[in-house]
Amino acid sequence: CDTSSVSAEKGLIIRGKPLLDITHILPEEVFFLLLTGRLPNEAELSELNNEFSSYLNIPEYVWKVLSEMPNDAHPMTMFNTGILAMQGESIFRKRYDEGMPKTEFWEAILEDGIRLLAKLPALGAGIYRMRFDKGDRIEPDPQKDWSGNFVHMTGLPDDSGDFHKLMQLYFMLHCDHEGGNVSAFASHTVASALSDPYYSVCAGLNGLAGPLHGLANQECLKFVLSVRDKFNGLPTEK
């Protein structure tokens, strides 16, 4: 994989650009950078944003499926279920069944990827509000960027904009995992069978759910919160 690497001296490098040099760019720009090896110009970014904006909404049947899950279902299980429920929307699957030539496989895969990526913030935020009883879902705002929309749809206050900046950086840090870890390897393996992105992304999420992979983030947060509680709040700068 040549889309990203980790250097002992420079840290995370995405398509030849050190992370610290591109912390100001939008997730949509990172997506374009990963695919093409360069940052988009203004017209290309606008076109990509318009493409994303066309596919922000989650089909209602997905919410119905999720609403029937147990109240104590893990958000990752719900997230995975939501994506898999949308597999019938796959452009690749439909075109493959119609006899699409191999030379056009990449086009259908890319279309699936864009449509799925566009929906993930609404799915994740909607599951958060559903799972933790935060009220009705909040509709996406097509004027906001990918990370900004996620923050908006969680309903969490962000008057300072710090949460938006944090999510923007967090998404960038996790945008590409070289290919050697469990989730990336699982996704690549499933995709190699010409399973569409809905299937392959779900395979990666199943690996990500393990305590030696993505679930470690949750365990780490639990530890940090326990330390905070033990010392009665956040530490001072001293």
Name each model feature, range by range:
Residues 1-238:
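Hydrophobic alpha-helical bundle cores within soluble ligand-binding/oligomerization subdomains
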